[in-house]
Curated annotation (Swiss-Prot):
Single GO MF descriptor: L-glutamate N-acetyltransferase activity
Protein location: Mitochondrion
Annotated keywords: Acyltransferase, Amino-acid biosynthesis, Mitochondrion, Transferase, Transit peptide
EC identifiers of the protein: 2.3.1.1
UniProt similarity note: Belongs to the acetyltransferase family.
Name of the molecule in the record: Amino-acid acetyltransferase, mitochondrial
An annotated GO BP: ornithine biosynthetic process
Superkingdom of origin organism: Eukaryota
Gene: ARG2
GO CC terms in record: NAGS/NAGK complex
Catalytic reactions of this protein: L-glutamate + acetyl-CoA = N-acetyl-L-glutamate + CoA + H(+)
Chain's role: N-acetylglutamate synthase involved in arginine biosynthesis.
Amino acid sequence: MWKHLLSGGLKVEQQNASAKKLILSVLNSTATKREARDYLTKYTRSDDSKQLNHCLLLIRHLNSLRQHEISELTSTVKKLGMLGLRPIFVIPPSRHIAKQAEILDIITTLAGFRPLQLQNSLSQSIDGTYTSILSSQNAILNNHELEVVPILKPYVYREKDASEFLTNDFTKFMQNLCKGNNTHIDKFFILNRIGGIPSNERNENSHVFVNLSQEYDCLKKDLKGQVDLLIERRPRTESLLHKLELHLNEDAINTLENQFKEHLQDLEMMNVVLSNLSSSATGLITTIESAASSSEKKNPLIYNILTDRSLISSSLPRFKKIRHTPPSGSRPAKKFHRMTYLEDYQQLDKSSPPDSALVTTVFKKGIDIKIFDYPKLTQFNSLSLPVEFRVKDSPQTNPLHKIDLSKLKGLIDRSFKRSLNLNHYLHRINGNIASIIVIGDYDGIAILTNEGPNDNPFVYLDKFAISPEMKGSLCISDIIFNLMVKKFPKELLWRSRNDNVVNKWYFQRSVGVLDLSIDLGDGNQTKSNFNLFYYGEPKSTNYGFHNLARLKEYAKHIRDIHPSWDK
């Protein structure tokens, strides 16, 4: 499928048949055409290109690696080079720096590179400012012929007294290391024994994707709270039994405390590093075991280089099982699909290693998100509003942000390749808007409205649009979908034409699908080429496909919505 894209010649650090075979293998099984083109544009170079692409690679607990893990990690590092990405190793501060440097030296050499151990990664001038070795040694690091891979030790050289010291603030060290350097770093990988940032929503498995600009503060607060709770060592009650319980579990609590401290530091480092790299840079935290996987389809590092995303989508429901039974009291119909939640990626064999998708978190610096909860659009909360929708009464307070209807319409027109009749559209939705979500500079939007009976409305996703040039990048679709289901967890509905190429994506994220041409009873049937999709609480008897009367309300109101396109 991708051979024609490679026909112009692939120039990477180790150009050979193995490299092409590796790339074709992964692209054929995982990547879209857009992702393949993006990869080839970013990581293949012409003969006169002076830029080398690098990844920062931090491996924790190196001194505990077993021989087979060293061998498998060596294979992964070699593949990084084949794919056009040269590693820069960073050693975390510990008592085992010399041993860890020795192991990295072996890995680098066996992977076909020339290791270069660098003692003082930072220099502190007399005025207290820092200079990164990534800047001062840029000419060597970017030399194509030398094939040098630096191994950076966590020491700082202090000009004031011509001394060196081991950093006592690794997060600050990483921040200064990446600040203002000329070395092109596109990825930051952290490998450890505990995996990515834990998520309560995923049964303590790792977050799949983190948009740092949106989620960092909340995640840091949660992790800090867990650390403080473990440090406090408070028994459940003051009874002797519970105090004894605490004492007997001291070792386990210590282990858990250290793990959460590590998670917290990993998150903080990811934030400061990505803040100093380009907006397109990606971070990833996973286990050493996953990163050492020989399967390119399951190795999160290899997969991310080729697709710039996580192994699974972050907006997929965690639990889903398909059933083909209609609700009680209705006639069987092939056009009805109902689903209930079942543990997705369920770990049946607890002794086997966890799936890489469960222990990997992908990070982006993130993009701006604005959520407008204006039921009605007026000239006071929007720009480019048609005159007929202006109101006389001014609000008591003016909103800080306004919806730009010109940009909103432009995005919808480009995304759907049709022209939206804004006046017709506003006549239908104005006054019934549940929320409008805007990503970046109108790179993505979701318009949600209140539909159905006045006394019992439901939330309907009326428009979901992503800028064509941004599709597949920055996980915008996943970000919007996650925001919607968190904001409206009980009921969220939308419709899509039967031949829409996005229907597979919709189907995977819904818990119910209904063909809107179905007979709703009493002769209530209309020809329709739309499917209805439902997301909501699976155990609720008041909402969703468990309630036949409510299901009919969904179907009738959504089926009968008239589109607002120019003819």
